[in-house]
């Protein structure tokens, strides 16, 4: 028996696939899901979505959102999903430098800078793991 995983962004259903296990980045740590997992809902953070089928592992970057697990269906609603191959370390390092140089003269600017820095650092961590 496998899990059916559905990943949805505001624009589209990004993909649907079956997997033996799914690991998601919750806002407070990672969570692994296997078949017959208890029903749950969680808030996603930025990080690596890992799908394992047989001996094959597939990784994607997700940016926030929610996960629901019910009856061996894993539904992931996220702001953004991208394959690990879509990222380039040199570009991410430039993006991080640019983000750290963003102005922080107001609460709104600080919040925006923190959001961008967190996303880029999560993307770099994902590349370091692969």
Task: Show which residues each predicted segment covers.
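N-terminal export/targeting signal detector
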Residues: 1-4, 129
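Compact, glycine-rich, soluble single-domain proteins
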Residues: 4-97
């Amino acid at each position: 028996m496998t899990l059916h995983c559905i990943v949805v962004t505001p624009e589209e259903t990004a993909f649907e696939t079956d997997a033996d296990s799914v690991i998601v980045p919750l806002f407070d740590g990672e969570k692994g899901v296997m078949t017959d997992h208890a029903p749950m809902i969680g808030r996603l953070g930025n990080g690596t979505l890992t799908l394992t089928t047989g001996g094959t592992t597939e990784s994607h970057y997700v940016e926030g959102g929610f996960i629901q697990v019910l009856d061996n269906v894993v539904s992931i609603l996220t702001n953004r999903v991208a394959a690990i191959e879509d990222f380039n370390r040199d570009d991410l390092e430039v993006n991080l430098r640019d983000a750290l140089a963003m102005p922080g003269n107001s609460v709104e600017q600080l919040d925006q800078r923190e959001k961008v820095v967190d996303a880029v650092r999560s993307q770099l961590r994902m590349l370091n793991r692969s």
